[in-house]
């Protein structure tokens, strides 16, 4: 069954995202896609709340979103781009690597992470590279390149 986009500015609801990505609670880290050009780029929102399980241990006295989860949220937005490539075989694309990731500022409960990803390249119809950035209140908090691989 082909997955259809919302007609509203190529946005994706949380239900549509769940139809594209295999991630589920507590690892579904994209709440809404607010801009989407299939196979090219996407901009998404991750609302960071104190109710998320990682804040029980990271850190109880001063909760911070773990950097690996910021990168994972960028990877999930990148995964939305890669899964929508019309010429690629259908299957499970997994996170295969990162390059030049830098963390600039902490992300706290109550923040809204705005994640932008853009496709950089596809090789041999099974490897993809995406440039990702995450912002809070217009300030860059994390950026880097993310790689994906198609698993048979």
Curated annotation (Swiss-Prot):
InterPro entries: FabA_FabZ, FabZ, HotDog_dom_sf. It is an enzyme of class 4 (lyase). Its EC number is 4.2.1.59. It comes from the Bacteria. One of its GO terms (cellular component) is cytoplasm. Keywords: Cytoplasm, Lipid A biosynthesis, Lipid biosynthesis, Lipid metabolism, Lyase. CDD domains: FabZ. GO terms for molecular function: (3R)-hydroxyacyl-[acyl-carrier-protein] dehydratase activity. Signal peptide: none annotated. GO terms for biological process: fatty acid biosynthetic process; lipid A biosynthetic process. It holds the Pfam family FabA. It catalyses: a (3R)-hydroxyacyl-[ACP] = a (2E)-enoyl-[ACP] + H2O. It is found in: Cytoplasm. The active site is at residue 58. The keyword Ion transport does not apply. Involved in unsaturated fatty acids biosynthesis. Catalyzes the dehydration of short chain beta-hydroxyacyl-ACPs and long chain saturated and unsaturated beta-hydroxyacyl-ACPs. Belongs to the thioester dehydratase family. FabZ subfamily. NCBIfam families: fabZ, PRK00006.1. This is 3-hydroxyacyl-[acyl-carrier-protein] dehydratase FabZ. It comes from Prochlorococcus marinus (strain MIT 9215). The gene is fabZ.
């Amino acid at each position: 069954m082909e997955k259809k986009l919302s007609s509203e500015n190529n946005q994706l609801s949380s239900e549509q995202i769940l139809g594209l990505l295999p991630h589920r609670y507590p690892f579904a880290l994209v709440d809404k896609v607010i801009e989407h050009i299939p196979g090219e780029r996407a901009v998404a929102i991750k609302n960071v709340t104190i109710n998320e399980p990682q804040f029980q241990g990271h850190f109880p006295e001063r909760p911070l979103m773990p950097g690996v989860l910021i990168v994972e949220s960028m990877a999930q937005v990148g995964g939305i781009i890669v899964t929508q490539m019309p010429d690629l075989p259908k299957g499970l694309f997994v996170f295969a690597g990162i390059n030049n990731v830098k963390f600039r500022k902490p992300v706290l409960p109550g923040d809204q992470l705005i994640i932008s990803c853009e496709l950089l390249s596809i090789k041999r119809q099974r490897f993809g590279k995406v440039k990702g950035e995450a912002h809070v209140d217009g300030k860059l908090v994390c950026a880097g390149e993310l790689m994906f691989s198609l698993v048979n």
